[in-house]
Amino acid sequence: MKKANVYINEIEAGTLSELDLGKKYRFEYKGNYRGNPVSLTMPVSQSVYEFNLFPPFFDGLLPEGYQLDGLLKFAKIDRNDLFSQLLAVGDDLVGNVTVKKIER
């Protein structure tokens, strides 16, 4: 299972987990987090969100076109491994969101 911490404005907001190798994902806010939501579709009032596909908000942060091709080649990531793609670019995302891999 892959996991990543998600930060908003450099404050840890929660954890994104891949539960079933590309088939199930979970985002969970930290219990004490009271900042801005990661996405308007995932308000802080609910602490756990589960998805059967890669969460749309995070999917929208991924590179496309030539940038995606370059990332896949450079990092040797499978085109369908969206979680690994997010981890590879997580320090340089558009906006105030940062994603960092949780090392086991």
Language-model features: locations:
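Phosphate/dinucleotide-binding and metal-coordinating scaffold of catalytic cores
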Residues: 1-104
